[in-house]
Amino acid sequence: MSIRAEEISALIKQQIENYQSEIEVSDVGTVIQVGDGIARAHGLDNVMAGELVEFSNGVMGLAQNLEENNVGIIILGPYTEIREGDEVRRTGRIMQVPVGKELIGRVVNPLGQPVDGLGPINTTNTRPIESPAPGVMDRKSVHEPLQTGIKAIDALVPIGRGQRELIIGDRQTGKTAVALDTIINQKDEDMICIYVAIGQKESTVRNVVETLRKHGALDYTIVVTASASQPAPLLYLAPYAGVTMGEEFMYNGKHVLVVYDDLSKQAAAYRELSLLLRRPPGREAYPGDVFYLHSRLLERAAKLSDAKGGGSLTALPFIETQAGDVSAYIPTNVISITDGQIFLQSDLFFSGVRPAIDAGTSVSRVGGSAQIKAMSKVSGTLRLDLASYRELEAFAQFGSDLDKATQAKLNRGARTVEVLKQGLHKPLRVEKQVIILYALTRGFLDDIPVVDITRFEEEFHAWLDSNATDLLEEIRTTKKLADDDKFAAAINGFKKVFVASE
């Protein structure tokens, strides 16, 4: 067997030509300290603020503090397996969550992973959780109503699509009930709802999901949950994950409602992280950028211009107060960021006025321009009537000699309070709200006993469905008040068959 030198040299040349040198370079650091959901790593010289990093056991982290000789990382998962000396590497990515219509009807955690036991979510679309809010020229003024189905809100503090309306009150005053009723009322409104539960008990979140399912609202709702048992980083990230999922729909021309329940717990989680990262504390031990924490979240709610597709994202943030103190740090911050607030008062709640909305201190700064014409006509004097009733009510307790005008105001006020009461999970279509408020403000209910007002209203709505569908349809389609004669005929027609209690 003869060896030919030319063949060998040709083979060697071919090998050299085909040789590819692939070197994989990754920026790696070493964990020097770990505990309480925080790790400090040496190295990672080129890491970006907010970049995802990966520990050797596969757990992800978020680079937060970029210091001279180490990086402070918040750990997004179990941290008990991470040890001093472990390797941590850059990923080159900032944190993203899955988005898209595949998430609708599902319960997910702030990382977009399903927690409802219904299998994986088949979406490949993702969006970064931190993204700039739409600019001035990309927005349009709020002009379309978002009907909550709650008379006291739609009449007194109307909400428009693209608005940010704060719901504030002590614990156990019905804040979550207001949000759930609003979500349930969006059934035929082509609206996608996102309910973000921050620091809630898992049993509470389960009840919310079951309530939504029972009313058929889970078909257009995404639930994002970071329960009280989960680490602080997930509570901090939950609202951003929720708004990111909503933005995907908004930028595609859809209308979205995002409920944050509640931002007080997110602020507390952020305070915990900041103190563990050794950032200097400020007022109430919150870090200096706690205002920016909420402003950058709520500024992402917008009504987009027609050039951008005309979509909208409406935000309903919740804040829990301590003993009605709205002058604390976080409540005043969020009040100054939002376009109005709905105060829920515990004394009203416990006296049986539910929803316990305080008409005197609740405002909507931009919702008035979104209210339909019919509603603004019938609810025009409602706020003043209620305010003067509350004032007179206090004086009337001291003396019994009241002139007729004062007595009439007290009678009308008592009926107004009764009409604005509403049962749990019983949102009302706007046309029915308009008719009952018309009956109230035009004096048709003045001769109905106060104890019968609630029953009168329930029976009246049932009567309208079978005897005055044309009137309901006219208000629904034109969004304007029908002729006074039509209203009077309908109301008087029902009053003839209504039997007052003895």
Swiss-Prot record:
Keyword Transport: yes
Catalytic activity: ATP + H2O + 4 H(+)(in) = ADP + phosphate + 5 H(+)(out)
First-level EC class: translocase
CDD domains given in the database record: ATP-synt_F1_alpha_C, ATP-synt_F1_alpha_N, F1-ATPase_alpha_CD
InterPro entries from the UniProt entry: ATP_synth_asu-like_sf, ATP_synth_asu_C, ATP_synth_asu_C_sf, ATP_synth_F1_a_nt-bd_dom, ATP_synth_F1_asu, ATPase_a/bsu_AS, ATPase_F1/V1/A1_a/bsu_N, ATPase_F1/V1/A1_a/bsu_N_sf
Cleavable signal peptide: none
Compartments where located: Cell membrane
Site positions per UniProt: Required for activity: 362
Topological category with respect to the lipid bilayer: Peripheral membrane protein
A family per Pfam: ATP-synt_ab_N
Coiled-coil annotated spans: none
One GO cellular component term noted in the UniProt record for this chain: proton-transporting ATP synthase complex
Region described as Disordered: spans on this chain: 115-135
Binding site for ATP: 169-176
Any one Gene Ontology molecular-function term assigned to this protein's record: ATP binding
Keywords, ordered alphabetically: ATP synthesis, ATP-binding, Cell membrane, CF(1), Hydrogen ion transport, Ion transport, Membrane, Nucleotide-binding, Translocase, Transport
Cross-referenced PROSITE patterns: ATPASE_ALPHA_BETA
Record-listed E.C. numbers: 7.1.2.2
Domain of life: Bacteria
Role noted for this protein: Produces ATP from ADP in the presence of a proton gradient across the membrane. The alpha chain is a regulatory subunit.
Family the entry assigns: Belongs to the ATPase alpha/beta chains family.
Oligomeric form and interacting partners: F-type ATPases have 2 components, CF(1) - the catalytic core - and CF(0) - the membrane proton channel. CF(1) has five subunits: alpha(3), beta(3), gamma(1), delta(1), epsilon(1). CF(0) has three main subunits: a(1), b(2) and c(9-12). The alpha and beta chains form an alternating ring which encloses part of the gamma chain. CF(1) is attached to CF(0) by a central stalk formed by the gamma and epsilon chains, while a peripheral stalk is formed by the delta and b chains.
Full protein name: ATP synthase subunit alpha
Name of the gene this protein is made from: atpA
